[in-house]
């Protein structure tokens, strides 16, 4: 395996690479053929129920696992599975990260309400199994919590369900929408909107991003803008342009391929009802005002309405992070030392892929902004990937302690 400069530039700037293969259909701006009809909860219910029934059509299936964060999407899918297949035994799984916001109590309440067995994975050192996870995905991503979910799930069942796609398809990234709308106006050009969009994803890059790379990787922001521009150079509404960019970004080229590779490794069948062709087609034809309430900054409106129908709305947190580790605290506990261990004698620096001076400038600092911590985690993942597949000096069983 060799280094693809464009891939590394994209992953370390956008946290995804559009050259990757994805199981999801790519969307173009003209796929958003907006109709004028009000949203139909019955249609959404039918599509989800049909998908679940077809995926678990084998009568021998007695048990299924589900990743339950306690948020809207995973809770709703749990309710649908419980109602569609009431005889099925369900094991829900949540992840609790050390020194991070603990949302597992919410997930436990939802699991108890729907009478399913709930399991919590506690991760003291989130990065410990990074070599093993990267050996499976074969991509230099550090945010691989799905490895732990799938590893646990395969002890219960060969089916793993999730609420993946709800945010991208039904408009759940409300904090980004509000910021994007504040940065743009009706006269904004496609380039101005592309730049504003990236400002809404600031945690993926650093202020001196151009200094991160070595001599073998050409970086300019124009190369990044060129990949984003097509999503904003069309006649769609501003919010639909953002939804188009979100769908064709991390969902297509990070979350979906990563989760599928990990599930395949553990011989798990993925069940993702919110990413069925029917749901994607229906949601993209739904006017954005029916997905996102700009005045009250509320997204995923149809899914919230379904939660209320299933009497789950009172159990869901108003602000939900999902499976999210506090990287600032992770830096203090494990990540800084691990980065020093692996990046102080870095193979990717020696071979000209990453700028060693940039690493030296920041690695000893204890007051790093979260953007720089995240960048170091990305560099650590790249270093691990490089030692696994290029220099081949690291074993996948290596633990980062």
Segments from the language model and where they lie:
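N-terminal glutamine amidotransferase
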Residues: 1-35, 49-53, 146, 382
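Acidic, carboxylate-rich catalytic segments that either coordinate divalent cations
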Residues: 4-7, 348-401
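Short hydrophobic-aromatic micro-motifs
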Residues: 5, 12-15, 23, 160-162, ...
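ATP-dependent adenylate-handling active sites, centered on carboxylate activation for C-N bond formation
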Residues: 29-239, 261-310, 327-328, 375, ...
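Active-site-adjacent bridging/hinge elements
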Residues: 121-129, 252-257, 350-361
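Bilobed periplasmic-binding protein-like "clamshell/Venus-flytrap" ligand-binding domains
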Residues: 239-250, 376
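Short Ser/Thr-interspersed hydrophobic loop/turn segments at strand-loop and sheet-helix junctions
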Residues: 247-261, 282-283, 381
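PAPS-dependent sulfotransferase catalytic core
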Residues: 311-369
């Amino acid at each position: 395996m060799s280094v693809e400069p464009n891939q590394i530039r994209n992953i370390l700037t956008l946290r995804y690479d559009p050259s990757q293969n994805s199981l999801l259909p790519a969307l173009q701006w003209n796929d958003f053929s907006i109709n004028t009809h009000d949203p139909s909860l019955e249609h959404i219910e039918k599509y989800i129920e049909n998908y679940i029934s077809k995926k678990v059509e084998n009568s021998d299936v007695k048990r299924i696992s589900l990743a339950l964060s306690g948020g809207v999407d995973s809770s709703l899918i749990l309710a649908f599975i419980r109602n569609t297949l009431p005889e099925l035994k369900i094991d829900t799984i949540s992840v609790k990260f050390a020194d991070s916001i603990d949302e597992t109590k919410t997930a436990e309440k939802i699991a108890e309400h729907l009478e399913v067995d709930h399991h919590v994975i506690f991760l003291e050192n989130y990065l410990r199994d990074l070599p093993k996870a990267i050996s499976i995905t074969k991509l230099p991503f550090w945010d691989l919590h799905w490895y732990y979910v799938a590893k646990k799930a395969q002890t219960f069942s060969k089916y793993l369900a999730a609420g993946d796609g709800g945010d991208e398809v039904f408009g759940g990234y409300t904090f980004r929408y509000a910021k994007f709308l504040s940065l743009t106006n009706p006269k904004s050009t496609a380039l101005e909107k592309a730049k504003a969009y990236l400002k809404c994803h600031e945690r993926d890059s650093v202020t001196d991003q151009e200094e991160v790379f070595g001599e073998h990787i050409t970086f300019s922001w124009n190369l990044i803008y060129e990949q984003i521009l097509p999503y904003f150079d069309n006649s769609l509404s501003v919010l639909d342009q953002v939804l188009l960019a979100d769908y064709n970004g991390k969902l297509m080229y990070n979350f979906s391929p990563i989760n599928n590779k990990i599930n395949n490794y553990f011989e798990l069948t993925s069940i993702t009802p919110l990413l069925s062709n029917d749901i994607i087609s229906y949601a993209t034809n739904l006017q954005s005002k029916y997905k996102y309430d700009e005045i009250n900054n509320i997204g995923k409106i149809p899914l919230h309405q379904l939660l209320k129908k299933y009497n789950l709305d009172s159990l869901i947190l108003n602000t939900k992070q999902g499976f999210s580790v506090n990287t600032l605290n992770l830096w203090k506990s494990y990540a800084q030392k691990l980065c020093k261990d692996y990046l102080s004698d870095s193979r990717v620096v020696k071979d000209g892929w990453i700028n060693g001076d940039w690493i030296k400038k920041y690695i000893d600092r204890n007051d790093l902004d979260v953007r720089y911590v995240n960048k170091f985690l990305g560099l650590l993942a790249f270093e691990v990937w490089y030692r696994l597949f290029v220099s081949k000096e690291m074993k996948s069983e290596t633990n980062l302690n």
